[in-house]
Amino acid sequence: MAFEGLADRLQQTISKIRGKGKVSEQDVKEMMREVRLALLEADVNFKVVKDFVKKVSERAVGQDVMKSLTPGQQVIKVVQEELTELMGGEESKIAVAKRPPTVIMMVGLQGAGKTTTSGKLANLLRKKHNRKPMLVAADIYRPAAIKQLETLGKQLDMPVFSLGDQVSPVEIAKQAIEKAKEEHYDYVILDTAGRLHIDHELMDELTNVKEIANPEEIFLVVDSMTGQDAVNVAKSFNEQLGLTGVVLTKLDGDTRGGAALSIRAVTNTPIKFAGLGEKLDALEPFHPERMASRILGMGDVLTLIEKAQASVDEDKAKELEQKMRTMSFTLDDFLEQLGQVRNMGPLDELLQMMPGAGKMKGLKNIQVDEKQLNHVEAIIKSMTVLEKEQPDIINASRRKRIAKGSGTSVQEVNRLLKQFDEMKKMMKQMTNMSKGKKKGFKLPFM
């Protein structure tokens, strides 16, 4: 989970004050001392921590909080609001050119994930916003950079504009934008060159590309796990180019959160997107308020619902609901439902979006074995149509055949059939409970 270490510390700290009917200045002072230590250990910029603690302390000991009926809850609300403000307040959306194409310039150091992020962004613009993006290979220095972008283009079935590595990035950008205008592309995403460190040559070239491309957005791609190094890189790029946004990669593996909590305050540049995995759909808009809620253990129901709406086919969900009511739910239906849930993302991450997940020890430490889910899929796919519709006919010899065909063991086949039988019994109970009610039970997110 992103920011797991910081979240644990902050949740432990605020739990001490949550249920208090009366909160003194000393209580606030002690809480903020622990908050300060937690933020510093998370590699948050020292000045940012100092300002944050000051703002929360001043608001937390104010009359509105101290005289409220639930002062403990009010203090936590103040912490959440200031944490949200620290990360940018509201979601910052992509600017759109008055006349297409909208040009987005991707910049950053080598190794931050700039090329992959360019592909992810193009994929997001096409899938979620129904736009037509063009990827442009403007990194002519890194070996295989052009090849990498072309490979991503093939995976996404998306055009990649390239003039090879013997043409200047300025000329590449110029010709790419002309082609995008001719062929009516909505977005041009320039994957520019990076370096192992910031130098004048790199900045001069990027400045020249900026002048010719006139981009609506200049996104800096940084590795969130590098903490204050990411903040320093953002500061340097912002001074030279005037960044419009930051994309934090590897946020799913960042247990501390120093970069995310410092970048906006230090550079006044919003975090636009967060990379949450290696898959090409693992890029999400950065929502400061939702992230603050997750850090404080309040869950992120809105993101969970959005993921469900994007992954679950509404017509199929209604059909599935009807099958559950009539007890005609088969192993094929179960397999389809499992696939839709897996499309929403790693199951352990989805569980962490539930409010109060941090306080439930069993849920917090749960490790979902994706390999086990692969085994379940393989077992069901190794069954005949009749076996999937009537699992009761699966005798010992059939179980051996299914295990052999799926590369699993008979014990795993037995376990799946037992779990499916128990699930059907539970559905029957739910159906009986809903009798007499007009609507009956509904699937989640319906």
Swiss-Prot record:
EC class: hydrolase
Catalysed reaction, written as an equation: GTP + H2O = GDP + phosphate + H(+)
Binding site residues for GTP: 108-115, 191-195, 249-252
This protein's UniProt keywords: Cytoplasm, GTP-binding, Hydrolase, Nucleotide-binding, Ribonucleoprotein, RNA-binding, Signal recognition particle
SMART domains, per the entry: AAA, SRP54, SRP54_N
GO molecular function terms noted in the UniProt entry: 7S RNA binding; ATP hydrolysis activity; GTP binding; GTPase activity
Gene Ontology biological-process entries: SRP-dependent cotranslational protein targeting to membrane
Compartmental location: Cytoplasm
EC number assigned by the record: 3.6.5.4
Keyword Nucleotidyltransferase: no
Classification via PROSITE patterns: SRP54
Pfam family membership, one: SRP_SPB
GO CC terms in record: signal recognition particle
InterPro entries, sorted: AAA+_ATPase (IPR003593), P-loop_NTPase (IPR027417), Signal_recog_part_SRP54_M_sf (IPR036891), Signal_recog_particl_SRP54_hlx (IPR013822), Signal_recog_particle_SRP54_M (IPR004125), SRP (IPR004780), SRP54 (IPR022941), SRP54_GTPase_dom (IPR000897)
Subunit structure, interactors included: Part of the signal recognition particle protein translocation system, which is composed of SRP and FtsY. Interacts with a small cytoplasmic RNA (sc-RNA).
Function per UniProt: Involved in targeting and insertion of nascent membrane proteins into the cytoplasmic membrane. Binds to the hydrophobic signal sequence of the ribosome-nascent chain (RNC) as it emerges from the ribosomes. The SRP-RNC complex is then targeted to the cytoplasmic membrane where it interacts with the SRP receptor FtsY. Interaction with FtsY leads to the transfer of the RNC complex to the Sec translocase for insertion into the membrane, the hydrolysis of GTP by both Ffh and FtsY, and the dissociation of the SRP-FtsY complex into the individual components.
Family: Belongs to the GTP-binding SRP family. SRP54 subfamily.
Domain comment quoted from the record: Composed of three domains: the N-terminal N domain, which is responsible for interactions with the ribosome, the central G domain, which binds GTP, and the C-terminal M domain, which binds the RNA and the signal sequence of the RNC.
NCBIfam families per the UniProt record, alphabetical: ffh
Protein name per the record: Signal recognition particle protein
